[in-house]
Amino acid sequence: MWHNSCKCNQKDASPKPTIAKGHHVPGTRYPLEVQPNIPERLARLSELAVDLLYSWNRPIRLLFVRLDPVLWERCGRNPKLMLRRVGQERLDEAAQDPLFLEEYQRALSLHDTYHTVRIPSRLMDLDPKTDLVAYFCAEFGLHESLQIYSGGLGILAGDHCKAASDLSLPFVAVGLLYRQGYFTQTIDAQGNQIVGTAPALLADLPVTPACDDEGRELRVSVTLPGRTVALKIWRVIAGRISLYLLDSDIPENTAADRAITCQLYGGDRETRLRQEIVLGIGGVRALRAAGLQPTVWHINEGHPAFQILERCRELVNQGLDFDTALEIVAAGTVFTTHTPVPAGHDIFDEELFGRYLESYVTDLGIDIAELKTLGSSPISQGGFNMTALALRGSRLHNGVSRIHGEVASRMEAYIWPQIPWAENPVGYVTNGIHVATFLAQEWSSLFDMRFGSEWRNKLTEASYWERIDTISDHSYWSVHQSLKAAMLEAVKKRVIRQYRRNGVGEGLIHRLTRQLEPDAKGPLVIGFARRFATYKRAGLLFEDPIRLARLLNDPERPVLLLFAGKAHPHDHPGQNLIRLIHEFSRRPEFEGKIILIEGYDLSLARRLVTGVDVWLNTPEYPLEASGTSGQKAAINGVVNLSILDGWWGEGYAGDNGWGICPHKGLIDNAQRTREESAELLDILEQQVLPLYFDAAEHGYSRPWIAISKAAMRRAMPVFNAERMVLEYTRDYYRKAARHARLLAQKEAAGGRTLAQWKRAVAAAWPGVRLEHGNDTPESLKVGESLHLTILVHANGLHENDLAVECLFESQDETGEHIVRAQVQLAAGGVDSEGRLVFHLDHKPGTSGFQTLRVRAYPYHALLAHRFEMGCMAWL
């Protein structure tokens, strides 16, 4: 069990003394850390150690590696901790070493240049002097030295921060400081996932207290039932941006409240609710305490959505009514949803939510029923849905791939019940990964040698990356083989430790790891590393174990399968998948051919995505929102073999990997799983293996290298975080900033007007209906005009409150009706019966059989999206 018996509220001090085991070593060992004095010539090492720029600036990071490579690994690649542990003699030696001093000065130059030189603006109407984007997320994965992340959401948030920094975007991030972070994982001899925790000492983390201009540490507070919880604010420097982290583990609080920010995704539903109050409400207050006034607020997944209520409360305190406040707040808010799985959306039961949020009702000037309405949804069953709150409290919403955008539009269609799902306001921005973080050093060095340093400034130019094909196959293959060998060596060290701890004999260890010795003949290495959730179907390969065994045991075409990943401690089916793979790996026919690696983390992930040959992804369609691990693999020339879901639905081009079309139709999940498993094995047997082992006289397969180059060439300029953040800036941030300013100016005149208009429209809309004013002709000649008159029973609304539109549709080859044109009708006054009159005079642009549909919907110039009210009437 993964309990919430958090040890975070102990004093932040050195580890406890340990009792020596065994009669031959008597007494107690008391920890004592003797910290070195950093020589004056290296004084700024301390500054470099607390700027997470080191997480993506390789020369800065390598400076610490070269200081003491062994200690670097022992300290978990944590520069701040390393500087406390490094030997005085080594520091003194480095201070006299001309080569080290040269690298030190280079690192300082890179650091200072990064912070002082601004790149040419591509921010598209965002003014760094007046605009600020505040990005809220429950987790951030910037580097393993700050473990406040669990997986894809956190890594994506970290990459977003890094790209925002690289682009000099006016940007600040807000999260929670988890002392325990996410759980650590070991796998025992029976394949059981063993959950552990590793509380971090604050002194080890790259964080500093956030202070005001006079140097006083910043504190804010939030109200919980019967008490006030104090929060300390920590600041993380990540290049040009700051990340503010809230911490409840301070002496002013009770033990229970100190544990609120202890563990990421730990504890029960009440703990989760407390965390989200701290993140959303406390996060807004933290930014105010820091003197920051964001103009755009980005809610990354539903966890921080309570910030909407806090910002509304601020405006209500300034004299606005709640509806007006909500319009202004929503106008400046962007919401990104990340999961198509219902279980991924936080829902709090009515009693719990009411108990914790009742004090905010009075502050907002509404009753509890109105507040609950903001979080209502079909799946909440009377509870409060944080995704629903985020959707209703924002005006710009998106999924994280084209397919996921469509899925999210369907899932969240209840917000706009009368709007066809394909037209509702949910869009998409496909995720991207931070190239400087995940591109292997060997590839960076090769690009520097072949292309010069300019390639770093060409990350969004597709034509530039055509030059990948100019790299000789021999050079290209040599880099990949070097990365593969390093990956296999790292994996071998990990699994040998794992096996020895589990009591595996040395003879069996040798047999289990014999394929981790690369040679010219192979093996082909297939990697599967991600969260072990059931919808990701880690066991898809094992539907036909006899056929799989035949593939893996061909001596002429050796194959190695590497699996890694964690299952949430409460996800028992996910843990069963881990056991399943472990059991298969110990069968005689799979011995040494399937390896399950424990302790999946960022370091292992970087090794795998740069070193395997094939990246396998087998989600149940359409439940893979994005799948950024495949993007990380592709930019390193690793070939994807994946279900066409998430990003791969856009990334697959036929020449850059393999895609499995989801098997749809009237089949159950079990049948679909069997069919897709068979197709996966077909592709491996008939395409992947023959191509990879087509070595001919070169010692490597030229056709394989062509696919690998295409994978890199196509992924690099499209699926990177720089493109992603620029897209958010163009399509979301600048619109939110402009819209919020428009509604807030002149003492919120626009917000008041829009709120009043929406109330009037909502009251009148049930009585709105359309009827014909003339007969619709059944045929026309090309060049003739179609004349229509539509009469609208407007129920008190005026002609400028409505848009009336005619849709021209025709069928495609599948029989689906496709909208070919949308034409607005012109207002023509009021008839004798008080009906609004609208006219159409339109010449169809194409001949052939078509159908027409006419609809009306509310219109106001201040709407962010024409369908945001969710109202529509059809003829």
Task: Name every feature range the model reports, one short phrase each.
Residues 2-875:
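Catalytic cores of carbohydrate-active enzymes across secretory and cytosolic contexts
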